[in-house]
């Protein structure tokens, strides 16, 4: 899978430990200062993916629906987060699967003592960082290239998730080269990026109008859309910088 965001743009020579990890369809890049923190992320992915698979086996409709979904109160944590995010955006729960797995993995890393932790799950990124991190935006064939966003040091987890109609195999009904959403609720950022990307058609007016999909949701800090030669931003967007965005850095299946 090609994903529109790469957290290793402008990668310094002394970059912390980075590991590519695959568990069935889940393919992530994990970055941390300590191998124990990476192992914590991998174990969390194993646990929560297993819980999700068990739930889907009991109700296959969960995986198929593109509409809001109701789950029992005793559903696994991963399922409840996905349902809440999808319902908030008026779409199906699988729209939040990658961001939710990323968030749960980083939460486990923090419990293990990490102050610097990044999990990139196909362009849906959860992170906590005690130093600046540049997230590079990959927007396929768009003429807008080498664009990065600076995430300043912070002591709590945040997320940046992306959707694209022109890049990668994920379901999108729009024409965005990249639609990114910023939120401390990483599950919501993932579902919202899907909803935002669905609204993007070709042209400047469509880019401007697409942000209606995410306005009015307090937990969403900001959003960015790239379509062809056009770029639009709404709300609080991290500082823009130039980044060396290389296709080979992208976490993909």
Swiss-Prot record:
Q: Which residues form a coiled coil?
A: none
InterPro entries in the cross-refs: ApbE-like_sf, MA1715-like, UPF0280
- Family of this protein: Belongs to the UPF0280 family.
Designated name of the protein: UPF0280 protein Mbar_A3697
Q: Which organism is it from?
A: Methanosarcina barkeri (strain Fusaro / DSM 804)
